[in-house]
């Protein structure tokens, strides 16, 4: 049974009865046999979520796709088989001849006949191309598809004639005929181009500003290639890289910016993203066209780093810029070193900006006086410590930590056997606003604990 279905299907293909088609209207077109929708799927949210809107065309009638529901075609072929004479070798040769006939011969003949009516000089051909672009644009706005096709052939004839009577190599390099005509017809930077023109302009959708580059697509003046670039790097976009490519075609009664606006709104609903930090830093260093850099308000080309105080070329002697990836326990020390170096660097820069007459030599701090002997009548320290007790550091095990004396800490854990406690700094947490506009914790002292001996702490009274 399956072999019979395959034979009937192959005979229909050989006879030219069966071929693949596309679904033009997903909501109304139904199968001729079963009556179901040819494409019973909703609008996809991402690429290839559902099968493509294809169907089978048999004797001019549309049926369900053969891969999804092959019974429809099989039932129709059983009731309407292919005549045997349609599958003879002679019929196959006629079908092959019809399919192998070069479809470009008629078009080349039309283009050659049309080119014979065009001017011979370069300036005249450029003017013809510009007029054809304007005619295509008006035809699209007036929904005159046939007029747009005629104007498109006139544009192609100008390219064909300027290229020496052939399309071969007409877009090979920047000096080729098609590239020369595209530059001549290009729209003014910042102005929305017409259909058939190349150019770039600024689009805005729900607060998202987009630099739109428009180039010619594949298929004539009514196809277009949109290149979307992020303008404000700290805001949402339709791609994590700050760039998105999209091919589209003209729609009757709509301008280029209206089509781009619809595409951007659809992409923003389905793929709203913030830029990746690496791509944001890369784009922040790239220059913008003059017309785009002068818009109001100006483009926000901020880096992903919240605070970037690096100036490697201006570091004074004794400082060096280091990028490092460290474990968490070592990164804590590196951050403390960086904070100390940042403060010293800021002081050095401020001193360098002072007039020479106002500079003051640094005052050498006086040596700390020796600690007085402990007073025997002083209040005794508590015999035990407990979690949550606020204590003051009174001594350290090495002079390098002398600046820690007097700092207050909060005890979290106790080890009576070793007469040690674990405590964190008595400081409030710090917060900041990240590039996504969210409040995040920048520093929490409770996450960093140190070990102290009983004799190093005193209860803060």
From Swiss-Prot:
Bilayer-spanning residue ranges: none
The keyword Transit peptide is assigned to this record: no
Keyword rRNA-binding attached: no
Keyword field: DNA-binding, Plasmid, Transcription, Transcription regulation
Tree of life domain: Bacteria
Region feature (Disordered): 84-107, 349-379
Basic and acidic residues compositional bias, start-end: 357-377
Signal peptide as annotated in the record: none
Record GO terms (molecular function): DNA binding
Biased composition annotated in UniProt, kind: Basic residues: 91-101
Induction comment: Expression is decreased in the presence of KorA and KorC.
Domain comment in the entry: Contains a DNA-binding region joined by a short variable segment to a region similar to E.coli korA and trbA.
Name under which the protein is recorded: Protein KlcB
Encoding gene (name): klcB
